[in-house]
Structure formats: C-alpha cells, structure tokens
Amino acid sequence: MSSFSTTTVSFLLLLAFQLLGQTRANPMYNAVSNADLMDFKNLLDHLEEKMPLEDEVVPPQVLSEPNEEAGAALSPLPEVPPWTGEVSPAQRDGGALGRGPWDSSDRSALLKSKLRALLTAPRSLRRSSCFGGRMDRIGAQSGLGCNSFRY
C-alpha cells in the first residue's frame, strides 16, 4: 500500500470512530430509565392535583374580610388624594424653606469642605486603598497587602 492510501484509510477509520462516538455524547440521556420518568410524571400529576389552580377566582368578599390574627395589629391606611399633575406654589418657589434642594451655594460649600477634609487627612489614610493602617503595616513588612507598592 502506498502512503496516500494508508493515510486515507486511517483518516476514514478515525472519522468513523468520531461519528460513532458522537451518538453517545450525552451519557445522561440513557441514564434515566422509562420507569423513573413515569414515576416522576406521576409525582408531578399528584402535586398538580393537590395544588390549587391559579386560574381559580377567589371571591372578592374573601379578600376584603380582615384576617382575625392580623386584623387587630393593622390599622387602615390613610387616604391619599390622587395627584392632579399640578405643582403647588410652595414647591414651585423652592420648597417649604424658600430655597431649592440643590442651592448652588450650599452645594459648593459642601464640596469644598469635603475636598478640604480629604486634603488635610494624614498621608497613610489617603493612600490606603483597601483595609487601613494594620494592613498597611503588614504590607510594608511582608510585601503583601494593599499598599505593597510605595510611590
């Protein structure tokens, strides 16, 4: 035999084994017997008989009757009038305090104070990226931890 025919025959045998192997690619398919499937189906049917159907309509009087156990602890919710889509003059002018919730002077003062606090914080607190001082000391001695790379 020539090398071409040997290669062709070996390729065809390999292809045949691959095709036969793919028919049994899912080992779980044959692992479940028909008897097990029938038992599972019977169990599901039995559970469906015990469970109430979602399509059944519950009478409205059952829903409106207060539960005796929870009825004593619950009080009725106050009626809230529906929103008409109109804004009251107090809301339009900036709320009850006479200014908007995002007054620019208050917001800028808050941002300035936070930035000042960040800049005046100790160096170790500013550079600590994970856990804090203790992890910083461990990292400095062992090379482990969050701050193992110093700038």
From Swiss-Prot:
GO terms for molecular function: hormone activity; hormone receptor binding; neuropeptide hormone activity; neuropeptide receptor binding; signaling receptor binding. The record marks R123, S124, C130, F131 as: Cleavage. The modification Phosphoserine is found at S129. Coiled coil: none annotated. Residues 62-105 are annotated as: Disordered. Residues 1-25 form the signal peptide. GO terms for biological process: aortic valve morphogenesis; cardiac conduction system development; cardiac muscle hypertrophy in response to stress; cell growth involved in cardiac muscle cell development; cellular response to angiotensin; cellular response to hydrogen peroxide; cellular response to mechanical stimulus; cGMP biosynthetic process. The precursor molecule is proteolytically cleaved by CORIN at Arg-123 to produce atrial natriuretic peptide. Undergoes further proteolytic cleavage by unknown proteases to give rise to long-acting natriuretic peptide, vessel dilator and kaliuretic peptide. Additional processing gives rise to the auriculin and atriopeptin peptides. In the kidneys, alternative processing by an unknown protease results in the peptide urodilatin. The keyword Glycoprotein does not apply. One of its GO terms (cellular component) is mast cell granule. Disulfide bonds join C130-C146. Keywords: Atrial fibrillation, Cardiomyopathy, Cell projection, Disease variant, Disulfide bond, Hormone, Phosphoprotein, Secreted, Signal, Vasoactive, Vasodilator. Residues 147-151 are annotated as: Important for degradation of atrial natriuretic peptide by IDE. Pfam families: ANP. Residues 93-103 form a propeptide. PROSITE patterns: NATRIURETIC_PEPTIDE. Changing R123G: Loss of cleavage by CORIN. Belongs to the natriuretic peptide family. It is linked to Atrial standstill 2: A rare arrhythmia characterized by the absence of electrical and mechanical activity in the atria. Electrocardiographically, it is characterized by bradycardia, the absence of P waves, and a junctional narrow complex escape rhythm. Atrial fibrillation, familial, 6: A familial form of atrial fibrillation, a common sustained cardiac rhythm disturbance. Atrial fibrillation is characterized by disorganized atrial electrical activity and ineffective atrial contraction promoting blood stasis in the atria and reduces ventricular filling. It can result in palpitations, syncope, thromboembolic stroke, and congestive heart failure. This is Natriuretic peptides A. The gene is NPPA.
